Structures are given as structure tokens and as C-alpha cells.
Design a protein with these regions (language model features):
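Structured, solvent-exposed acidic/aromatic patches
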Residues: 1-197, 234-239, 247
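C-terminal functional modules
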Residues: 190-277
Length: 277
């Protein structure tokens, strides 16, 4: 593709990038970077080689939200069907992500989720592995704020920045420092979701994930899943890895398969135990 990087084609034939070849190259390099991090424990030498190839390629990886891989759908967004139509619309967002974002007072909540309809409102997901409560209660928890015509996100530039941040943390040549790339990832995510306040959020060195108080009084969890804060700390590489993966997890919502893959690889984010049902 690189040899034909200017040979754009009909936008009618491309519902993701509108026929722009360079966007496809950036997407391919970003996927290559993702795969390099995935094998970084099994083959660190090859992982570094492939990651640096992707980032330092003449076209490079996704770096702005204009590069995001998003599918313009000819019909209904499948997440809208899953969350609002399938099985009586009893799917809801996870209590894990709402507990992290509530603790961080994350401005993206209103863009990502619907408010719960419990008496106190707020953003409350539902814990994994519960016995599903009756419909009235189940429907009161927060849902994914998705419309029938919402574009389907495949990969975003925020993830690319967080992947580069992890590579830089390992000492790889990622074109910037781990801190710079971590903060860039957060800013890109805020921009993607159309919210303000990224600078104040990045500087927050005290907020931590909350315990989970189930507004229905059924499955609360008082323990702290993690004490990870948001602000970068050059003195603690291990905590910075947790920061990177945690913020990537938030930025990648609702891409559950990628979240699960990274959880298996890194053990982050730290999650509540599954409720045995």
C-alpha cells in the first residue's frame, strides 16, 4: 500500500475511511503495533522490532481522531441492538468501569453511559456473574449511550498512543516519552468523546477507583479494586504500566474483546471478583 499511498479510491466503496489509502496504512501499522505488544512477553526482541517498524514507518500509525477506524453502518449499530433490543434490553454496562470512572469523576461518563434511573441517579453498572434482577430493577442501571446510527468503532488513535506509551516504558523507540504518549492518549479519548477537562484530569494525583455501592442493594462491593491514580509518576514504572492499561481500557470502551485480551496479558485493570450465580 505504501507505494500507492496517494491512490485514493471511491468513498462509496469504503465505509471506514472513505477511500483514503493513507488511513488504511496507518490502521495497518497500528494493528501491527498492537500485535507487537501482544507478543512482548513471548518474544520481546521481535516485539520491539515490529513495534518500531510500525511507529517509524514513513506513514506511521494513527495519531489523531481523524485517523480512527470507524464503520459507517448501512443499518442499525449492533451495540444498540444488544443493549436495547436483545433479550428485552436487559444488557447493561459493567460495574467495574463505572466504579473506576466514578472514582476519577471522569467527564466522559455522560458521553459513554446513560444515567441510572435509581432515585439518586448517577452512573451505576451491573456486576459480572449476578442473578439478573427483575426487569424493572435491571433496566434502572446505566446503559451504553449508543444510537441506531452511531458509527461502529473498530480502533481509535487513543489506543495507538497508549500502545506507544507501553512500548516507550519498555525502552523502545516510540517517538516520544511514555509520559507524553500516555497523556496524549487521554487527550485523544476526551476529544473523541467530545468532552472537556483533559488537562485537569491528567493532573489528578489523588482520585482512585471507588468501591461499588449497588443502588439496588443487591451486589455491593466495598473493597477497593485498585488504588491507581491518574497522574503519571516517573518514579514507579509498575504503577505507570497499570495507568496505561487502565486508561486504555476506559478509552477503548465498548471494545470488550480488546479489553479482555489485554486483561489476560497484563492483569490490568484490576476488577471486582465475579459474583457466583
Amino acid at each position: 500500500l505504501t507505494a500507492n499511498r496517494t491512490a485514493d479510491f471511491s468513498a462509496q466503496a469504503d465505509r471506514i475511511f472513505g477511500g483514503k489509502v493513507e488511513n488504511w496504512i496507518k490502521f495497518a501499522n497500528s494493528q501491527k503495533l498492537r500485535m507487537a505488544l501482544r507478543i512482548s512477553k513471548a518474544n520481546p526482541t521481535l516485539a520491539q522490532q515490529k513495534a518500531e517498524e510500525a511507529v517509524n514507518h514513513e506513514v506511521g500509525v494513527m495519531t489523531t481522531n481523524a485517523d480512527n477506524a470507524e464503520l459507517t453502518l448501512a443499518s442499525t449499530n449492533p451495540f444498540e441492538i444488544i443493549m436495547y433490543e436483545y433479550n428485552g434490553g436487559d444488557s447493561r454496562v459493567s460495574a467495574d468501569i463505572t466504579s473506576y470512572m466514578n472514582g476519577y469523576n471522569d467527564p466522559r461518563r455522560a458521553a459513554m453511559f446513560t444515567e441510572s434511573t435509581f432515585a439518586d441517579g448517577g452512573y451505576y453498572g451491573i456486576r459480572t456473574g449476578i442473578n439478573i434482577p427483575d426487569g424493572t430493577i435491571a433496566h434502572a442501571y446505566s446503559n451504553y449511550n449508543v444510537k441506531t446510527d452511531s458509527k461502529l468503532i473498530i480502533m481509535n488513535s487513543a489506543e495507538s498512543a497508549f500502545l506507544r506509551a507501553e512500548g516507550a516504558l519498555k525502552g523502545w523507540n516510540m517517538g516520544a516519552t511514555a509520559k507524553e504518549l500516555y497523556e496524549q492518549g487521554i487527550k485523544l479519548s476526551f476529544e473523541q468523546w467530545g468532552v472537556q477537562g483533559a488537562d485537569a484530569y491528567i493532573a489528578d494525583n489523588s482520585s482512585m477507583p471507588q468501591g461499588y455501592k449497588d443502588p439496588a442493594g443487591l451486589n455491593s462491593y466495598s473493597g477497593a479494586t485498585s488504588q491507581i491514580t491518574i497522574a503519571w509518576d516517573d518514579a514507579d514504572a509498575a504503577k505507570n504500566l497499570e495507568r496505561i492499561i487502565t486508561q486504555k481500557w476506559i478509552a477503548n470502551f465498548p471494545l470488550g474483546i480488546e479489553a479482555w485480551s489485554e486483561y489476560r496479558r497484563t492483569g490490568f485493570p484490576k476488577l471486582m471478583p465475579v459474583v457466583v450465580n
